[in-house]
């Protein structure tokens, strides 16, 4: 029994077939329509019945449109070109003394996502660096590096899904979340509560 390969229109025999998109292909005929890289069955995108690799081809051709995303019809802004080195004079008046460093935190201030030409790679809320698939831990609806998912008070490393949250930031359940945001009252230990010191009984 044989089938016809949708790409080369030659017979496909059972020992050489791969099935994808509801058709049987020769192994080396299942290629991306744009870059012609060999695809694995089920591990590719599809558009109008034709196979495409997910990145970069499908994303560039049919992905979301917008500034710096890279699909058809998007707007790609070029970075400003620096002036040629020959025009810059090297006189001492062009140099400024180094500025002292401030004691700011290491976390970078910036957008929560790093734009790429095929979509978005998220930035870690803990350190501000890109989080790649192999190193990500998903918690609070965002991707984190494993060592960056820490309690905001005691800095203990947390496990995804087994910690408390307040204003989008992670806290360990005990003692930090309870101490900071738990109920207020006698001997609980928060601001505004009454903590009684043990009474020293001295004989007079």
Swiss-Prot record:
Recorded superkingdom: Eukaryota
Start and end residues of each LIM zinc-binding domain: 3-64, 122-183
PANTHER family for the chain: CYSTEINE-RICH PROTEIN 3, CYSTEINE-RICH PROTEIN CRIP FAMILY MEMBER
A cellular-component GO term for this protein: cytoplasm
Keywords for the protein's UniProt record, in alphabetical order: Cytoplasm, LIM domain, Metal-binding, Repeat, Zinc
Name of the protein in question: Cysteine-rich protein 3
Biological process per Gene Ontology, one example term: T cell proliferation
Tissue expression remark: Expressed specifically by the thymus.
Lineage per the UniProt record: Eukaryota, Metazoa, Chordata, Craniata, Vertebrata
Keyword Cytoplasm listed: yes
PROSITE patterns: LIM_DOMAIN_1, LIM_DOMAIN_2
SMART domains, alphabetized: LIM (SM00132)
A GO molecular-function descriptor: metal ion binding
Keyword set includes Transferase: no
Location of the protein in the cell: Cytoplasm
Region described as Disordered: spans on this chain: 88-107
Pfam families xref list: LIM
